[in-house]
């Protein structure tokens, strides 16, 4: 008589995964049944996380009430948020949820390699390109020398001893094998990819009834690049940094060399998919792949990220560069990965070529490094801390040589957008500077959930900067991170 085949284990659905993450107690995991001849053992049922679910519902309702309306009032939303946070805290006490971050095994730092000497010729090439760009325009020889300098510096710091960093991994199965083994994951990932791609490219052909001057300048700048005007900065634009215009010109060249408003949105929509992919990788690095898939799906259909790719006002490449830079920074610190830190520094330098908002990125890196050093239990990490700072400064400066040269040629024009907002350069300050600072700080704290303080071009006036779903999850997620941090210190 042939032996009876055991029943195949049931695959986990996304709904079951969410319920499991919310209901499992910290440290508990599901114990698979032994599959004895008597059938599968009964699995212990987990109580539904009613308190956490109630917090989610109240937070969604609170944020919905902050949508633009004639009688919008924040009082009721604040009350609902207070109740939501109370339920969230109660759910945490009942162990309905816990933020269990993944903890990879660090391999040990090795900042300097056998090819470190390449840094010297790399700095030499970067310095030479600085003087070759003295006319304020990119030329083919100058671009080649600058690129060579960046490549040599990266190669000089790149860790080639992969055996010391990467454990041997088994060969990845073919797509068919992976589909047979984990079809729920493959189907879910494919569905998310299709939905995100649809939201990214849907209705790109629509044009606003009236273009503003910033959008028109953006259009003509890309057109000028295609006709040979390869400037280091484009001062007439809302954002003068050049990288986004060159990206749009590159896409236009691939499309036949004709510029249109639809083509500009398409170029930045394609770049936006990179940001969505790295949202998945970042969340997967911190938690797991299912959480990463959920995060990518929410980010890919969210109002604010899509708006950045369609407004054509200078932020089209900001998120596609910023998110990978943060990912590689955190991954490098968690895994002692020098190469990840290098990539983050490279992206930070490219970010300075993209938008002035990246001028704050060095401060973000410093804060992250200080927190990492504070929680480190090894005295040797102090030397690593200063080595990473030096690495960021070197790679970032070499990568940002074109914008540094543009700054030295015309510092007033580069600083004008910044100084006009923090001083009386263009108009007198309407009040006490300290009072204005705190008023602006309070307004900035309310951008996500109360009012974006923007025009119709880059948002819906008097509406929160993000959609109601993102706004509610932002508040709950922020509280969860703070609570989990307090538990871990």
Predicted segments with their positions:
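Hydrophobic core segments of transmembrane alpha-helices in multi-pass, intramembrane catalytic enzymes
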Residues: 146, 272-275, 299, 314-326, ...
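Short helix- or helix-capping micro-motifs
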Residues: 196, 295-300, 348, 352
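Transmembrane-helix motifs of polytopic, lipid-linked glycan transferases
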Residues: 262, 266-286, 324, 475-479
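Membrane-interface transmembrane helices that cradle and orient dolichyl/undecaprenyl
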Residues: 109-110, 155-159, 325-343, 351
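Transmembrane-lumen/periplasm boundary regions of multi-pass, lipid-linked membrane glycan transferases
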Residues: 199, 204-232, 240-242, 246, ...
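Juxtamembrane segments of multi-pass membrane glycosylation machinery
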Residues: 247-270, 304, 452-456
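Start-transfer (signal-anchor) and selected internal transmembrane alpha helices
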Residues: 6-13, 42-56, 80-199, 374, ...
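Short acidic/glycine- and proline-prone juxtamembrane loop motifs at membrane-interface regions
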Residues: 265-268, 304-317, 356-357
